Swiss-Prot record:
It is found in: Cytoplasm. This is Acetylglutamate kinase. One of its GO terms (biological process) is arginine biosynthetic process via ornithine. It comes from Dehalococcoides mccartyi (strain ATCC BAA-2100 / JCM 16839 / KCTC 5957 / BAV1). Substrate binds at residues 46-47, 68, 166. It comes from the Bacteria. GO terms for molecular function: acetylglutamate kinase activity; ATP binding.
Length: 272
């Protein structure tokens, strides 16, 4: 993998919801990255598991612009599933492969501090600040951090409000990559690549081009927070990519060979 000037070997990886599938190879790839001397930092979501447990508990799932409206009861489920079940399943899988890993949430050591986005979406929040102290301590101890995006509700918290927030894992990944000045930010998702205005798959794009895709509305749905996070990371000197995590060993292929999905660089590329 080609390193940037800082060469700190940190790779921030946003894991898609398929990582617990027995056929998924992402966690095996992470073991290989460790052997190559890289320092993976994992951020995960788990929306489908949250929705499944919400249904079991008789709670309605409501979405606004693709993000979960998080009322008081839903926040309980989000915290229990993301910071608990999903996080520990990933940690256990890594431990089973011989990788030292520790599961944390954004609440631990105030790693991710946030604020409520809007009253109508409840405890759905946005990142205000990232504290890298705990993440760095784990990396220094050769322990792979596995981070749930459940975060600390501190900024502008109304009196009587809860101290937890549900924050989308995509922007959390971008903010953490930026704060760590990571070498790479990688999104493992369920599409082959970012698409251009004519539906064509885009291989390498500049930060400016990514911004144009967002401004024009060409990027839509779940691709919006991913591209925004890629832009955040490139401003800190990282390169970022979005690849299809459904294909075997795409993570290791991207980080050793490249050109597996869409790479966003901070450079200004000449485009036709």
């Amino acid at each position: 993998m080609e390193m940037t000037q800082s060469s700190n070997h940190i790779v921030v990886i946003k894991l898609g919801g398929s990582v617990l599938d027995s056929k998924d190879t992402s966690l095996k790839d992470i073991a290989t990255l460790k052997q190559l001397g890289l320092k993976p930092v994992l951020i995960h979501g788990g929306a489908s598991t949250v929705s499944a447990w919400s249904a079991k508990l008789g709670l309605e799932t409501r979405l606004v612009n693709g993000e979960r409206v998080t009322d008081d009861a839903t926040l309980d489920v989000v915290a229990a599933i993301l910071a608990g079940l999903v996080n520990k399943e990933i940690v256990a899988a890594l431990l089973d492969m011989g990788i030292k890993a520790a599961g944390i949430s954004g609440v631990d050591s105030a790693t991710i501090t946030g604020q409520i986005r809007a009253t109508e979406t409840g405890y759905l929040g946005d990142v205000v600040q990232v504290n890298t102290e705990l993440i760095t301590a784990l990396l220094d101890a050769n322990i792979t951090p596995v981070i749930s995006p459940v975060s600390f509700h501190q900024t502008n918290r109304p009196s009587g409000s809860r101290r937890l927030l549900n924050i989308n894992g995509d922007p959390v990944a971008g903010e953490i990559a930026s704060a760590l000045q990571a070498e790479r930010l990688v999104f493992l998702t369920d599409v082959p690549a970012v698409k251009g205005k004519n539906g064509e798959a885009l291989g390498e794009i500049s930060a400016d081009h990514a911004a144009e895709l967002l401004a024009s509305g060409t990027a839509s749905g779940g691709m919006i927070p991913k591209l925004r996070s890629c832009l955040k990371a490139t401003l800190a000197g990282s390169s970022a990519c979005i690849i299809d995590g459904r294909k075997p060993h795409m993570l290791i292929r991207e980080l050793t060979e490249g050109n597996c999905g869409t790479t966003v660089t901070g450079q200004h590329l000449r485009r036709s």
